[in-house]
A protein has these predicted regions:
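Substrate-binding pocket helix/loop in short-chain dehydrogenase/reductase
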Residues: 5-7, 14-16, 119
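C-terminal substrate-recognition "lid" of short-chain dehydrogenase/reductases
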Residues: 27, 127-156
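Active-site helix of classical SDR
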Residues: 30, 67, 75
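Alpha-helical segment proximal to the catalytic Tyr-Lys
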Residues: 35, 80-81, 147
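Residue(s) in the substrate-gating loop at a strand-loop-helix junction
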Residues: 51
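Short, small/polar-rich loop/turn modules that mediate ligand/substrate recognition or access, typified
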Residues: 83, 88, 149-151
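Short C-terminal tail/terminal secondary-structure segment
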Residues: 150-178
Length: 178
């Protein structure tokens, strides 16, 4: 079952799993793809999927946010490193998305099957991201229409990072794990 993890109660196993999935795997997949593309003289595009949580993230997502922050740095670094090989590396960093997985996760946490719909109604666009619009954004980034963009992080959410009516802050102090 899902459990939030903050800086005080994240264990090494969870931290290593987050890094393995969100940082290590993309690192070596990009490495293998780049070697093939360079050897075969292929111009192309690599698109990473990031998260708005990479910017700092919610306290209860500390290992996840850390791993996605590392992915953003990898994207910018490799986008620069491979540009003379005509390999574009960019990232779409998505916000809260209305996926089947997210619905199941939120319902298991809250017991409320309508939680997402109620919260989405309070958002500026009265909804959260749809997986189909995320897919369309990735298709655009992978197409020639994205031009020479490389090493770029595109934040795909209904907020502007750093622009708040009232700056967010944690609701409570952290408690030491039991």
């Amino acid at each position: 079952s899902y459990r939030p993890w903050n800086i005080l109660d994240t264990n090494p196993d969870l931290f290593n799993r987050m890094i393995a999935v969100n940082t290590r795997a993309p690192f070596f997949l990009i490495q293998d793809a780049a070697k093939i593309m360079i050897r075969e003289n292929i111009e192309g595009r690599i698109i990473n999927i990031g998260s708005m949580s990479e910017q700092a993230g919610q306290p209860f997502l500390c290992p996840y946010s850390t791993s996605k922050g590392a992915l953003a740095t990898l994207t910018r670094n490799v986008g620069f490193a491979l540009m003379r090989n005509r390999i574009h590396v960019n990232q779409l960093s998505i916000g809260w998305m209305n996926s089947d997985h997210e619905r199941k996760l939120i319902e298991s946490e809250t017991g409320d099957p309508n939680f997402i719909d109620r919260k989405a109604a309070t958002k500026p666009f009265k909804r959260i991201l749809d997986p189909k619009e995320v897919a369309k954004a990735v298709l655009w980034m992978a197409s020639e229409d994205s031009g020479m963009m490389t090493g770029t992080i595109v934040n795909f959410d209904q907020s502007i990072w750093g622009a708040y009516d009232d700056a967010p802050s944690p609701e409570n102090a952290l408690d030491l794990p039991i």
